[in-house]
């Protein structure tokens, strides 16, 4: 039996109770799990500080000296605070304990020399160390200490005595049991070419490093390995998919496309739109299924590109569908497409949950007999009952709301899988796109159509509301509409957030001369629909809402977006909300309202929003500030991945390196037959 598959209970120092806590809190069940539970930081244990050199902003430090005396203070019922006065000859500090009286007096003696390791804090005129690590100075060789690893632990673990130091001791115990070198997981041609240390050396050095260089080399090796296998699996999946699924060959540009291009094109295509259309046309004529991700900021003209792609399918005798994440968005796409296709003899229908009875049957019949050219809808389109005569093109809007299973259901609607174009207005940084959407080819529309004015973003504090209300009034009197966004629907006892209901009433009092709508996540779809419709039609001038308006709503007349408690939102979310305005020819504004208590990170977020409208710049900054968040581990190609040490946000260079090495192997062995790569496919 492989030693790393051993149950963690059998490691000396664990036992049944610790096994249960390690399993529940950290998911550590085997020796392998413990070995792959990596430290989050290190502290240099080769250096000693003098008490006279200590300062409050120091992290963990160690000092050498002796205990002068002990002192006790009662702290309520049967609780004591024990203080040891400690000197190194250059100053005096205190060691403080709040429990463990018997242990302390049994193990630590006055005038004996100890090495103290902990974080210094300043209290009552002198530095103190609370519950530090204490070692007998005569038994500790500093040169052997190297870098001390620190492991993330939970409150439950600490209560059970499983501290970072305890995890460190267990890991060292495990490493001492590994008498044989760990099996290598990367082929020699990769480790040699990239100068990576062996897996065995990396695992030992990451838990028991002697120097900073040890930690760096170990981390690079293990991060590369993790990211390499993610990329290899993604590229292998994409390669298999391309070989298995033939695509329809759409090499004809016919009457519908040409008429639209000559008569109905609302504006001259931007250079970016032309480039993307060229990429899409090449895919559709290639004989293999198109799987393309189309990224573009709000208002960049993605829908127009998608429609032109659908017209190519129609000219080649096939049908097209467009899936949206919400009914509101599906209806807006339907109206937009019908407007674009005015005067053209094409049948475009809606299929969502609200299309029922006779009308629904008409749509289902029209899809089967081929009389419907384009259907726009929600997930209702992928229901088993929905069948097409010839589905050749599928457009999916806002991909992160549709997983790989939904895409696969679309493929089953036709003899060959339809060409798939995935649209997203959420800009995805390159390193993340490479991992999350690694099986899709990526196109980017990075220009706005002519005539669009950049949105002005302004930061205001919550004590400047009077001038803000005056500005809102001015805009509405000019005939514009306004969004006011709150972060939560229910009050939180822990956070001073405004309640949307109270906010709505307050806004009615402040703007009695205007009509207001409200939308929040707790409302039924029909209620939301009705309130939204009032705003879209211009019956109401102000929409008070939570972030349910984040995706897709298009009201060209809305020129002001006010985001209250903006410090509570992430960068990408703020950018998405801002994208609800700026859709008409008039100047638009996004007002970020915060309190004065801003952290350094929050201030940075607000500054970035005010400085740029570039979604990709914002996405990169958000990834660095916040990390990949929900996207991590939800690989869209259907390949799950769990990153234990790599960080897509900060390890872009290693992601790129891993991608290049994986691509070389797939190019050299697309069918995974070559013997020299066997170890890679067996993992």
Question: Where are the regions a protein language model picked out?
Answer:
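OB-fold nucleic-acid-binding modules
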Residues: 37-68
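Inter-lobe coupling/hinge segments of SF2-like helicase ATPases
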Residues: 275-278, 289-607, 671, 683
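Long, highly charged, low-complexity intrinsically disordered interaction regions
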Residues: 1-12, 24, 230, 240
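Short, surface-exposed secondary-structure boundary micro-motifs
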Residues: 66, 119-120, 233, 566, ...
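C-terminal accessory region of SF2 helicases/translocases
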Residues: 585, 589, 598-683
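Upstream accessory/linker segments immediately N-terminal to the RecA-like ATPase cores of bacterial MutS
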Residues: 73-264, 668
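N-terminal pre-Walker A segment at the start of P-loop NTPase domains
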Residues: 263, 267-277
């Amino acid at each position: 039996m492989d030693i790393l598959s051993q149950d963690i209970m059998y490691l000396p120092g664990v036992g049944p109770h610790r096994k249960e806590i390690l399993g529940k809190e950290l998911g550590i069940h085997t020796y392998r799990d413990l070995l792959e539970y990596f430290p989050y930081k290190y502290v240099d244990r080769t250096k000693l500080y003098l008490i006279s050199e200590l300062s409050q902003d120091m992290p963990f430090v160690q000092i050498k000296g002796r205990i002068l005396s002990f002192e006790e203070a009662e702290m309520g019922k049967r609780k004591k605070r024990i203080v040891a006065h400690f000197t190194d000859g250059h100053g005096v500090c205190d060691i403080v304990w709040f429990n463990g009286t018997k242990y302390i007096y049994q193990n630590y003696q006055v005038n004996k020399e100890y090495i103290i390791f902990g974080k210094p804090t300043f209290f009552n005129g002198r530095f103190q160390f609370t519950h530090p690590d204490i070692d007998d100075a005569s038994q500790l060789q500093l040169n052997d200490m190297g870098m001390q690893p620190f492991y993330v632990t939970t409150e439950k673990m600490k209560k059970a005595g499983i501290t970072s130091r305890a995890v460190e001791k267990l890991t060292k115990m495990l490493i001492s049991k590994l008498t044989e070198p760990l099996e290598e997981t990367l082929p020699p041609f990769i480790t040699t070419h990239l100068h990576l240390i062996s897996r065995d050396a990396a695992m030992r050095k990451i838990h028991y490093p002697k120097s900073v260089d040890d930690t760096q080399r170990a981390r690079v090796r293990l991060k590369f390995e993790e990211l390499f296998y993610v990329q290899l699996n993604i590229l292998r999946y994409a390669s298999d998919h391309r070989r298995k699924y033939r695509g329809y060959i759409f090499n004809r540009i016919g009457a519908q496309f040409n008429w639209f291009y000559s008569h109905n094109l609302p504006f001259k295509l931007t250079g970016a739109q032309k480039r993307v259309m060229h990429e899409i046309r090449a895919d559709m004529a290639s004989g293999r299924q198109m799987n393309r991700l189309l990224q573009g900021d709000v208002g960049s003209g993605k829908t127009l590109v998608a429609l032109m792609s659908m017209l190519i399918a129609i000219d080649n005798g096939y049908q097209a569908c467009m899936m949206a994440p919400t009914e509101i968005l599906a209806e807006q796409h339907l109206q937009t497409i019908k407007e674009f296709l005015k005067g053209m003899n094409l049948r475009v229908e809606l299929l969502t949950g609200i299309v029922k009875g006779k009308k629904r049957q008409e749509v289902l019949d029209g899809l089967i007999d081929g009389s419907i050219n384009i259907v726009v809808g929600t997930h209702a389109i992928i229901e088993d009952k929905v069948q097409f005569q010839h589905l050749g093109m599928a457009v999916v809007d806002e991909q992160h709301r549709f997983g790989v299973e939904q895409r696969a259901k679309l493929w089953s609607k036709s003899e060959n899988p339809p060409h798939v174009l995935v649209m997203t207005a959420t800009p995805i940084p390159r390193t993340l796109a490479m991992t999350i959407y690694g099986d899709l080819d990526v196109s980017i529309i990075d220009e706005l159509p002519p005539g669009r004015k950049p949105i002005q973003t302004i930061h205001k504090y919550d004590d400047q509301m009077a001038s803000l209300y005056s500005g809102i009034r001015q805009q509405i009197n000019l005939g514009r509409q306004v969004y006011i966004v709150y972060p939560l629907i229910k009050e939180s006892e822990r956070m001073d957030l405004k309640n949307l209901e109270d906010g709505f009433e307050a806004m009615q009092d402040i703007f009695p001369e205007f009509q207001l709508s409200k939308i929040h996540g707790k409302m039924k779809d029909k209620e939301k629909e009705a309130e939204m419709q009032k705003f879209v039609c211009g019956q109401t001038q102000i929409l008070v809402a939570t972030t349910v308006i984040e995706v897709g709503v298009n009201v060209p007349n809305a020129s002001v977006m006010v985001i209250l408690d903006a410090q509570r939102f992430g960068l990408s979310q703020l950018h998405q909300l801002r994208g609800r305005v700026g859709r008409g020819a008039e100047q638009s504004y996004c007002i970020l309202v915060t309190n004065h208590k801003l952290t350094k990170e929050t201030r940075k977020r607000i500054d970035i929003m005010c400085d740029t409208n570039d979604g990709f710049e914002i996405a990169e900054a958000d990834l660095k500030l916040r990390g990949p968040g929900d996207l991590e581990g939800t690989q869209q190609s259907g390949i799950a991945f769990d990153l234990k040490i790599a960080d897509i946000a900060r390890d872009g260079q290693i992601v790129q390196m891993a991608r290049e090495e994986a691509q070389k192997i797939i190019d050299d062995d697309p069918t995974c037959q070559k013997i020299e790569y066997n170890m890679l496919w067996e993992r």
